[in-house]
Amino acid sequence: MTKKSTKAPAKKAAPAAKAAPAAKRGAAADSGKVAKTQLVEMVADQTGLTKKQSEEAISSMLECVVSALQSGKSVGLPGLGTLSVKETAARTGVRPGTSEKIQIPAGKKVAFKVASTLKGNL
């Protein structure tokens, strides 16, 4: 009679820890940035509107701001500042890595001027 060798059962691999959704939100909060979803929740809490109504209001406001900027208008946000479109001049730049001089064409950019009331409160 032959003796069967007894092997120890194989160890099961430890299950991989899943990142909790709350941990992801916490990481965004730690970065100092407020996401649109967080802004929607804040508006809903302060106004008593539903999250859906708050999201629609914020989206509509952002669309209006973008539309005004695209048409060349300035947008004043009381207590926050003013968004405006500024022309940028053509200029000579240097390509990183090759140090080659390149011509950067004229264009437009969005500028933001902080309200003095906000500056004083920071």
Swiss-Prot record:
<dbReference type="GO" id="GO:0030527">
    <property type="term" value="F:structural constituent of chromatin"/>
</dbReference>
<dbReference type="InterPro" id="IPR000119">
    <property type="entry name" value="Hist_DNA-bd"/>
</dbReference>
<dbReference type="GO" id="GO:0030261">
    <property type="term" value="P:chromosome condensation"/>
</dbReference>
<protein>
    <recommendedName>
        <fullName>DNA-binding protein HU</fullName>
    </recommendedName>
</protein>
<feature type="compositionally biased region" description="Basic residues">
    <location>
        <begin position="1"/>
        <end position="10"/>
    </location>
</feature>
<dbReference type="GO" id="GO:0005829">
    <property type="term" value="C:cytosol"/>
</dbReference>
<dbReference type="Pfam" id="PF00216">
    <property type="entry name" value="Bac_DNA_binding"/>
</dbReference>
<keyword id="KW-0226">DNA condensation</keyword>
<dbReference type="InterPro" id="IPR010992">
    <property type="entry name" value="IHF-like_DNA-bd_dom_sf"/>
</dbReference>
<feature type="region of interest" description="Disordered">
    <location>
        <begin position="1"/>
        <end position="32"/>
    </location>
</feature>
<keyword id="KW-0238">DNA-binding</keyword>
<feature type="compositionally biased region" description="Low complexity">
    <location>
        <begin position="11"/>
        <end position="29"/>
    </location>
</feature>
<comment type="function">
    <text>Histone-like DNA-binding protein which is capable of wrapping DNA to stabilize it, and thus to prevent its denaturation under extreme environmental conditions.</text>
</comment>
<comment type="similarity">
    <text>Belongs to the bacterial histone-like protein family.</text>
</comment>
<dbReference type="GO" id="GO:0003677">
    <property type="term" value="F:DNA binding"/>
</dbReference>
